[in-house]
Amino acid sequence: MYQRFFINLMNVTIVDYKSGNISSVINSFKEVAKDKVKIEVTSDINKIKSSDKVVLPGQGSFKSCVDGLNNINGLVDTLNEFAITNKKPLLGICVGLQMFADIGYEDTETKGLGWISGKVSKINNQNGKYKLPHIGWNQINIVNESKIFKDIENNSHMYFVHSYEFIPNDKNVISATTDYSSNIVCAVEKDNIFGTQFHPEKSDKIGLKIIDNFISL
């Protein structure tokens, strides 16, 4: 009965590739989904392929997260097929967003997924004026309309934990920035690909609304 109940529900997969503690991501998506959407947590490539939407979380360094993806046979190819070939909705969170880049410079020079051309570099702390990692609540400035920002007020506060920033080559993909040392990119949208540098799962009711907007696409 339980399996049959889910048979016609939308399926959202959170990719678990051992990138750190993703329990808050899982709990937030399940809270928003309730019994309307099936939330799956897996690295199984066949389950990812059959999903309606995918969430790519990321905690730790750029290199460790990329290595985590590469260590699971076929996972990167499956994500490329899902997001680039089939153009299904995908949301990257924190380092999950950063891995959209061509290259990252944390720990060592590491090739990213290359979905959105650009690089990931360390935030300029202006000779120690700004503490790194950047931890805590910060206002976001919505600079372009984004489907995941539906009914989100500009200058809302979101929760951040990061020392590196994504710098895309095409500024048109930027949907929001935050002021910390400089205007740091904190959200992007390119076709079916969405990303947040902040943690919506840790950003109270507004963050849950962003998750709901993604699920509702």
Regions found by a protein language model. Name each.
Residues M1-L90, K119-N124, I206-L217:
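N-terminal beta1-alpha1 cap of cysteine-dependent amidohydrolase-like domains
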Residues V12, I39, L90-L91, L113, ...:
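Hydrophobic/aromatic residues located in beta-strands of well-ordered beta-sheets
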Residues V55, L91, Y159, S175, ...:
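Hydrophobic/aromatic beta-strand patches that form the interior of the parallel beta-sheet core
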Residues D77, I103-Y180:
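Pocket-forming structural segment of enzyme catalytic cores
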Residues G92, G96:
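Gly/Ala-rich beta-loop-alpha elbow adjacent to hydrolase catalytic centers
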Residues Q98-F100:
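Glycine-rich nucleophile elbow surrounding the catalytic serine of serine-hydrolase chemistry
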Residues E165-L217:
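C-terminal and late-domain segments of enzyme folds
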